[in-house]
Amino acid sequence: MSDLVIETKKLTKIYGEQTAVNSVNLHVKPGRIYGLLGRNGAGKTTIMKMILGLTPITSGEVDVFGQNIKGHEKRIYPRIGAIIEAPGFYPNLTGTENLEIFAKLRGTPQPNAVKNALEVVGLPYKDKKLFSKYSL
């Protein structure tokens, strides 16, 4: 079993004649925060969408929590999250309130999931700070 949270192996996406992502290998360790940097059109969003199972993979593999997601993409949804491009949060609610709404919408069964997620990234639980006041 891998000690990686996310691993991609030769991840590739081709749209017609255009290669959007070419043989990308990522290794994401637990407890760390990562970001993808690059110019417009570099394939960052496409990579994230392939990892999340939202865009079909042309070739290569994605393993999440040591398991290949091919054919089981929805199985990983309760355990992962991502902000792609612009966050879709309610500015008049707190960060905790936003996360609790999205956890319910996604059917996250763990009662402490939001609290645990906030602890991982070093944010306070039940903070009164509105999302509109967060710095992205």
Predicted regions and their residues:
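Short coil-to-beta microelement around the adenine-binding A-loop and adjacent beta1/P-loop entry
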Residues: Q18-T19, K74
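Walker A (P-loop) phosphate-binding loop of ABC-type ATPase nucleotide-binding domains
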Residues: G38-G43
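Helix-to-loop junction immediately C-terminal to a conserved catalytic motif
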Residues: L52
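Conserved ABC transporter NBD signature motif
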Residues: G60-G71, R75-I76
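Conserved ABC ATPase "signature" region
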Residues: E100, K104, P111-K126
